[in-house]
Amino acid sequence: MNQLILASQSPRRKELLDLAGFSYDIQASHLKEEINRNLSPAENVQWLAEQKANDIQRLNPKAVVIGADTIVAIDGKCLGKPKDKKEAAFMLQLLSGKTHQVLTGVTVQSENRKETFYEQTEVTFWTLTQNEIDRYIETGEPLDKAGSYGIQGKGALFVQKIDGDYFSVVGLPIAKTVRVLETFGITPF
């Protein structure tokens, strides 16, 4: 059986692979995650997922590697992880009372094959008060998440509606990822 490697330090992606029952190793890619303003949100997440998978694949040519990236898009603007509390507040104000898209790109790659895809989910936020935003930022939760919120944590309190794959918003569309991994000969549980 091929070795499976997750090219991410995301605890949420780890939890989802654990939930599915995979045996895998973690080797985080240390590539700088920069959004390319010349690419669409869908192109960005797929490109970043491929870069992460390529980075780890070079070091482990016999392994099957999963690279993933998540961004939030609103009004054509891509939101990655905030640089600081001020940027987190700006992002949350931007999302307040509106519908945005959460896109997660995934690359599954072996020595001689690569499959890249993305999932897009629509998320609508309630209108947020500045007090709610400030209190949420003080928890520290939004500082390592695309769009400055975690739907699986306290950020769930901001979500009015979701249309699409919840797990994609968390960081990995696990059902589709499992199906792709199975075509590489990697099966869960």
Curated annotation (Swiss-Prot):
- Which EC class is this protein assigned? hydrolase
Show the active-site residues.
69
CDD domains reported for this sequence: Maf (cd00555)
Name it: dTTP/UTP pyrophosphatase
Keywords, A to Z, come to: Cytoplasm, Hydrolase, Nucleotide metabolism
Cofactor(s) listed: a divalent metal cation
Report the locations given in the UniProt record. Cytoplasm
Q: Which SUPFAM superfamilies match?
A: ITPase-like (SSF52972)
- Native source species: Bacillus pumilus (strain SAFR-032)
Entry keyword Lyase: no
State its Enzyme Commission number(s).
3.6.1.9
List the GO molecular function terms.
Answer: dTTP diphosphatase activity; UTP diphosphatase activity
Q: Which family does it belong to?
A: Belongs to the Maf family. YhdE subfamily.
What highest taxon heads this organism's lineage?
Bacteria
Catalytic activity of the protein: dTTP + H2O = dTMP + diphosphate + H(+); UTP + H2O = UMP + diphosphate + H(+)
Q: What does this protein do?
A: Nucleoside triphosphate pyrophosphatase that hydrolyzes dTTP and UTP. May have a dual role in cell division arrest and in preventing the incorporation of modified nucleotides into cellular nucleic acids.
